[in-house]
UniProtKB/Swiss-Prot annotation:
Disulfide bonds join C42-C105. Its cofactor is FAD. This is Berberine bridge enzyme-like 19. Binds 1 FAD per subunit in a bicovalent manner. One of its GO terms (biological process) is response to oxidative stress. It comes from Arabidopsis thaliana. There is a cross-link at H120-C182 (6-(S-cysteinyl)-8alpha-(pros-histidyl)-FAD (His-Cys)). It is an enzyme of class 1 (oxidoreductase). SUPFAM superfamilies: FAD-binding/transporter-associated domain-like. GO terms for molecular function: FAD binding; oxidoreductase activity, acting on the CH-OH group of donors, oxygen as acceptor. Residues 1-30 form the signal peptide. Glycans are attached at N80, N341, N359.
Length: 570
């Protein structure tokens, strides 16, 4: 005769079934919206708003608008496919309290929170993950308040650079801000990673002009510079804001610009002096008048049915055409610049020109308010830094390699000027003493895995080819040119070592200070992504559970059972 087991034990079949029950996807119990409902209730409680008023800001996968909201700020079509893992929820906050609630509720549900402002993360780390996650889309927090009297502006994280330039233009023709040339880039990512543009040699980095900031920390608190302290303020002005919290906005100092500036573009090919021009550029671009920024574009092309390389100098001079022509006739005769190559215009119009609007003086300024949503192509970017000029034979071999590969191009951005005057630890960005930065760039339109593989391989092959010509120990990279090829972090037992691989490339010796700050402000590593700053382990070496999972403790007949409940369903 069978006897009943003591109540302090659980039979094996029942124990197994109990664990299985707890670990089954919640959709199996017709609760596919449970995560959304739990988040919505939490969000409503934290914001003290009725749920009916916030449903336009919290989107589940079943919401008809979910796909369009997700796609709007995906700027790389490689991550806009049916096989790409989708977020469980997208939050589009419209206030500081919304952001605070989003952080608190995501933390409560133990979901990874990806933070997206403009969506220009080249490898998509602000909106993709291989683990269950939410997206906090900052695009609605876009206010730009310009105060010419104090030469300053408060810029929200979700504003675009085009909107910033337009709002400055509304108030003044002789003020500007030293930031990027792509108008749809979001301020939150651009400034938190350092930020640079075509006035970098005159004024330095964008973050050199940040006077204050607001951030939501891991506890949901809204902190300004005084409240967060100088360490955290330093970290979010070049060290990537998403590792420490959610940046709400920055107060920046505006810079003076002339009423008239000059732009020009000059092209040469291999049979017309391109090698000599590129070689000489290395000794002129980083050392000439700081008012002059000359970007070098190098691209394999077919000309007259012959494969060749085109080298183009695209430039901004903060002054008149006569001045820059006279300057470069002495310093850079290989360029062959003539006055007819130049166009004079306002600084704002030059921003339009750099956005490939060649009729910039005739374009409606409001074009910079257009966010060009859901218009991405496929692409890959990588970066390098050069500390010593590449020899002429190196340029020749580079051109041959680019012709062999077929499509991938290079962009050389000169430093020097103001950049060379600022200490490498003034901000987390450590590359100020380099001659120039290289961007590897390839775009394509075909939605094909095989074609994508080929272009990604081109980027890797050219990157490998350049090893002998670029920085070493570490081989440096620019944080805002996100590149997962240089290392990723799964935030497991080896999190620090994994983070150090890419962290040293991005931040050099500043990485150590960033890790200490991260550990102090977010010891549980809630704010994380595949290339975030890691934390130092606590004394017990404790690790968090995987994102998207929560620990549930149950007692069955006196025995304690620990189970993991999967909260995300696909």
């Amino acid at each position: 005769m069978l006897t009943t087991p003591p109540r302090t034990f659980v039979s094996v079949p029942f124990f197994f079934f109990f664990l299985l029950f707890l670990s089954l996807p919640l959709s199996s119990f017709s609760q596919s919206n449970s995560v959304y409902n739990s988040f919505l209730k939490c969000f409503s409680d934290k914001t003290k708003s009725p749920q009916s008023q916030i449903t336009d800001n919290v989107f589940s996968q079943t919401n008809p608008a979910f796909s369009s909201v997700l796609r709007a700020y995906i700027r790389n079509a490689r991550f806009n496919t049916s096989s790409t893992l989708k977020p469980t929820i997208i939050i589009t906050p419209r206030s500081e309290s919304h952001v605070s609630a989003a952080v608190t509720c995501s933390k409560t549900l133990n979901f990874l929170l990806k933070i997206r402002s403009g969506g220009h993360d080249y490898d998509g780390l602000s909106y993709i993950s291989d683990k269950p996650f939410f997206i906090l889309d900052m695009s609605n927090i876009r206010d730009v308040s310009v105060d010419i009297a104090s030469n300053s502006a408060w810029i929200s994280a979700g504003a675009t650079l085009g909107e910033v330039y337009y709002r400055i233009w509304e108030k003044s023709r002789v003020h500007g801000f030293p930031a990027g040339v792509c108008p749809t880039v979001g301020v939150g990512g651009h400034l938190s990673g350092g930020g640079y543009g075509n006035m970098v040699r005159k004024f330095g980095l964008s973050v050199d002009y940040v006077e204050d900031a607001k951030i939501v920390d891991v506890n949901g608190r809204v902190l300004d510079r005084k409240a967060m302290g100088e360490d955290l303020f330093w970290a979010i002005t070049g060290g990537g804001g998403g590792s420490y919290g959610v940046v709400l906005g920055y107060k920046v100092k505006l810079v003076p610009v002339p009423s008239v500036v000059t732009v020009f573009r000059v092209e040469q090919y291999m049979d017309s002096g391109a090698v000599d021009m590129v070689h000489k550029w290395q000794s002129v671009g980083p050392k000439t008048d700081p008012n002059l920024f000359m970007r070098m574009l190098i691209q394999p092309v077919t000309r007259k049915k012959v494969k060749t390389v085109r080298a183009s100098v695209v430039a901004l001079f903060l002054g008149r055409a006569d001045e820059v022509v006279a300057l470069l006739s002495k310093e850079f005769p290989e360029l062959g610049l003539k006055k007819e190559n130049c166009s004079e215009m306002t600084w704002f119009q030059s921003a339009l020109w750099w956005d490939n609007r060649l009729n910039a003086t005739q374009v409606d300024p409001k074009v910079f308010l257009d966010r060009n949503l859901d218009t991405s192509s496929f692409g890959k970017r990588k970066s390098d830094y050069v500390a010593t000029a590449i020899p002429k034979k190196g340029i020749e071999s580079l051109f041959k390699k680019m012709i062999e590969l077929g499509k991938i191009g290079l962009v050389f951005n000169p430093y020097g000027g103001k950049m060379a005057e600022v200490a490498v630890n003034a901000k987390p960005f450590p590359h100020r003493n380099k001659l120039f930065k290289i961007q590897y760039s390839v775009n394509w339109k075909e939605n094909s895995a095989e074609i994508e593989k080929g272009y990604l391989n081109q980027a890797k092959v050219l990157y490998s080819f350049m090893t002998g010509f670029v920085s070493k120990n570490p081989r440096s990279s620019y944080f805002n040119y996100r590149d997962v090829d240089i290392g990723v972090n799964d935030h497991g037992a080896n999190s620090y070592k994994e983070g150090e691989v890419y962290g040293r490339k991005y931040f050099g010796e500043n990485f150590d200070r960033l890790v200490k700050i991260k550990t102090a402000v977010d010891p549980g590593n809630f704010f994380r992504n595949e290339q975030s700053i890691p934390t130092l382990k606590n004394e017990k070496g404790m690790l968090l559970p995987e994102p998207g999972k929560a620990r549930r403790w149950s007692r069955v007949g006196g025995a304690t059972v620990v189970a993991t409940v999967v909260l995300h369903v696909f």
